[in-house]
């Protein structure tokens, strides 16, 4: 579940009362740098100059407020219907993390799933990794960590899972 999910809609558990929601946790410093880069590249197709510091300031404000609302909405989700999944479960160690996530949501992990996993996580040949730098957008690690302090406290617990 992205923190912005349900901010302008009903919570998914009110529509699907038996649902189990997965909240994937990732370091906001990494997310902000990546997100700002995405916005920059999207804006670069226009003929107007791109204000990199403006992108950083605007999206730090918007995303940190969205996270605050997401954390408040989270309180309405029954704990047994919410799985906190560190990004590392799927990002850096999917062979361990994918079965762990399946177990957490009560889904079986089969030999067929395990056999399909390498192809699902393989990077196609010739593709470039997305690279980004927080400072390019006029932001510092300290600013982002401060803006997401409440979320980082929650994420610290999820990362120990």
What are the residue ranges of the model-derived segments?
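PAPS-dependent sulfotransferase catalytic domain
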Residues: 1-24, 69-72, 76-77
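PAPS-dependent sulfotransferases, especially Golgi type II membrane carbohydrate sulfotransferases
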Residues: 15, 32-161
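Short, flexible loop/turn elements at secondary-structure junctions
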Residues: 2-4, 28, 89
């Amino acid at each position: 579940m992205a923190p912005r999910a349900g901010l302008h809609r009903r919570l998914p558990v009110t529509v699907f009362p038996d649902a189990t929601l997965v909240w994937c946790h990732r370091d906001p410093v990494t997310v902000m740098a990546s997100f700002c880069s995405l916005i920059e590249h999207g804006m670069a197709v226009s003929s107007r100059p791109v204000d990199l510091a403006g992108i950083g300031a605007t999206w730090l404000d918007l995303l940190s407020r969205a996270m605050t609302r997401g954390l408040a909405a989270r309180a309405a989700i029954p704990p047994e219907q919410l799985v906190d999944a560190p990004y590392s479960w799927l990002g850096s160690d999917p062979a361990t993390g994918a079965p762990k996530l399946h177990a957490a949501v009560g889904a079986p992990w089969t030999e067929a799933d395990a056999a399909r996993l390498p192809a699902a996580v393989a990077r196609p040949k010739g593709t470039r990794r997305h690279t980004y730098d927080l400072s390019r957008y006029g932001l510092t690690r300290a600013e982002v960590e401060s803006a997401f302090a409440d979320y980082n406290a929650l994420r610290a617990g999820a990362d120990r899972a």
